[in-house]
Regions:
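Negatively charged
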Residues: 1-116
Length: 116
């Protein structure tokens, strides 16, 4: 899937689980500008960009304060290397494997709470 998603209305969306995870040949090539999405109601981003090997867009302004699961969000997203230092994450959010096998895995400035 690589259709235009830049104008998706996510105002009622609570789960973005697996949205761009290995959904076909083009899944790895996904690299659209989704920085303007309102994800303030999303509670689950588990596996969202898992395997999205080309994705490297600025999503640093997203309001992720409602998210309780970032489980493997960027796992094997081998191009993703954006500044997420302004993300305010909920205490106790599940961040297991959030950056594993991505360029951000060993970058301490991007570590999620509780992963140091």
């Amino acid at each position: 899937f690589n259709g235009d998603v830049t104008t998706w209305d996510l105002s009622s969306c609570s789960s973005m689980t697996n949205v761009f995870k290995h959904t076909g040949v083009d899944a790895g090539r996904f690299n659209q500008d989704i920085g303007g999405w309102d994800v303030s109601y999303v509670t689950n981003m588990g596996n969202m960009f898992y395997g999205a090997t080309d994705f490297n867009r600025d999503i640093g302004d997203w309001n992720v304060s409602s998210v309780t699961s970032f489980y493997y969000t960027f796992y094997t997203a081998s191009s993703f290397n954006q500044d997420l230092s302004d993300w305010v994450m909920k205490d106790g959010a599940d961040v297991r494997g959030m950056y594993d096998d991505s360029p951000m895995e060993n970058n301490n400035s991007y570590k999620a709470p509780g992963t140091f």
